[in-house]
Amino acid sequence: MAQAESDAKKGWDKVYSEGFMTMWYPNEDIIRFCSRLIRKRLTHDRYEIKRPVERVLDLGCGNGRHAIYFARQGLKAAGIDVSEQAIEWAKDWALLEGLEVDFRVGDIEHLPYEDHSFDAVVSHGVLDHVPMQTAKRAAEEVQRVLRPGGLFYCDLRSTEDFEYGIGEEAAPNTFVVGEGYEKGLVQHFFSPNETKALFDGRFRILYSEITENRLGPDFRQKYSRWVFATESL
């Protein structure tokens, strides 16, 4: 397990040090999640408050785009990522914008936060980049750091995705990426039963969607993700 964690850290450090994965704008599904369940922007300085959310954690934050997004709205934002390089990017960005964001290097299976210390957690493209058992342990940690009734947003690659089955199979529905900037990293594709196993007993689903994009010159390649908004039990 320790070796796998070390390999993942090295892999993601390489991705970020070479300039990949440095997104500078929030994912649209997270914007919609915020607007529907946290706060909806009405004017340049006025919001409709949906739920009493003050502290938000970006789980697997990368260079910090979602933590920055929440901090810009006046929320107390934190971000954690396995990559030291990504966290350096994130800290520099927050400093440049004059925002206070608690960015840390850390492991999603052992979150360095007190119980019930967040009102919301968001996780974009993270729990599908680890084996299923790791994703389950991370979900347990998310539930621990969320207050009862706290919000958890999560999106996951689906077994209907066009890249399903590509690469060496490391475990059921889990494959090692064979080429590109994520070469050597793990990609898990979630079946319906696996999404159920991730949330059952921990979270109540508020809404769920499948987002799909058709790619390629003939639009036959289907990029498919599950999108879940849940609340902690």
Listing of model-derived features with the role each one plays in the protein:
Residues 58:
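Class I SAM-dependent methyltransferase core
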Residues 123-126:
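A short beta-strand submotif of the Rossmann-like class I SAM-dependent methyltransferase core
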